[in-house]
Design a protein with these regions (language model features):
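Conserved ABC ATPase signature
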Residues: 152-156, 160
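Conserved beta-strand-loop-alpha-helix hinge in the C-terminal portion
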Residues: 231-257
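Hydrophobic anchor residue at the start of the ABC signature
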Residues: 166
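Conserved structural motif at the start of ABC-family nucleotide-binding domains
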Residues: 42, 57-59
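A short, proline-enriched helix->beta-strand linker immediately N-terminal to the Walker B motif
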Residues: 171-175
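Helix-to-loop junction immediately C-terminal to a conserved catalytic motif
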Residues: 88
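The feature captures the beta-strand-to-loop junction immediately N-terminal to the Walker
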Residues: 73-75
Length: 297
């Protein structure tokens, strides 16, 4: 069945193009997350992962409902990627109580496209049956790249490459979509466009989503539920019942709360004052400039 294109237009990325100022209101409201009465798509009970003498995850319990959008926050080394790799089937979960759907797909920070295959063939990797090219084309049209069907990956921008990776994941109609910091390498403009695209794709396909991110604002804007992983355990859980598009008043207090759990401070970089040393400019011909001093560094 051919799926109607997502109602977003994505011409070639141009930083000079006019774009409305981003705010949570730019994301259209959506229905509430599925109720817990439904059978979960993901269920982990007492999950643990050790590498030698190092325990990365210990006694983790996690459920994700069909159609739920979950964001996973955590500091580096907290076990986020380890958990995602297990759910993706990249690491064995033998002997543990881990239930995941057979139909699942993952999108990484690096789009991981094969440069020797045209875009549509990257999307069609592993597909079986007839009309593979047409199915790939439909998926590319969904992400606004139907015109790049026969392009080579090296001719794509970073945002275009990530959209191809999304098309490759969703053409398989997964029950679970795993996103491992998929926007981290993108510029701010492209990142915001990708937020809207991912939400629209999620609404169209209604798969469950687990998104690993370091960006608290991104998690608040996109997710139904936010988890904080610390020391291999779920340290905090925030369920957001306010519809997308009405979260402006929620963003600031929730950001402060989550950053406090993560051990950070709100807008830490913005609050630091850059001070230039006075009367210490290098003389003409000197190659030794006075060091830049940053308060609180």
């Amino acid at each position: 069945m051919t799926r109607s294109p997502i109602p977003l237009e994505y011409p070639a990325m141009d930083a000079r193009a006019a774009l409305p100022a981003y705010s949570p209101q730019s994301i259209a409201p959506t229905s509430a997350a599925p109720t817990s009465a439904e059978a979960p798509v993901v269920a982990l009970n007492g999950f643990a992962r050790r590498f030698g003498d190092v325990t990365v995850i210990e006694g983790l319990d996690l459920t994700i409902q069909p159609g739920e959008f979950v964001a996973l926050l955590g500091r580096s080394g907290s076990g986020k990627t380890t958990l995602l790799r297990t759910l993706a089937g990249l690491d064995s979960a033998e002997g543990q109580d881990v239930q995941v759907p057979a139909a699942r797909a993952v999108v990484f920070q690096d789009a991981r496209l094969l440069p020797w295959k045209k875009v549509w063939r990257n999307v069609a990797l592993g597909l079986r049956g007839g009309d593979i090219r047409n199915r790939a084309q439909d998926a590319l049209r969904e992400v606004g790249l139907g015109h790049r069907l026969d392009a080579w990956p090296l001719t794509l921008s970073g945002g275009e490459a990530q959209r191809v990776a999304l098309a490759r994941a969703l053409v398989r109609e997964p029950s679970l979509l795993l996103l491992d910091e998929p926007f981290a390498a993108l510029d701010a403009l492209t990142r915001l466009r990708m937020h809207d695209l991912v939400l629209n794709l999620w609404r169209a396909h209604r798969c469950a989503v687990l998104m690993v991110t370091h960006d608290v604002d991104e998690a608040v804007a996109l997710a139904d539920r936010i988890l904080v992983l610390d020391g291999g355990r779920i340290a905090a859980e925030e369920r957001i019942t306010i519809p997308r598009g009405q979260r402006a008043e929620l963003t600031q207090p929730l950001r402060q709360k989550l950053l406090g759990i993560l051990g950070g401070t709100d807008a830490a970089v913005d609050e630091r004052v850059i001070r230039f040393p006075q009367a210490s400019y290098p003389q003409a011909g000197s190659h030794h400039a006075a060091p830049l001093q940053v308060a609180g560094a």
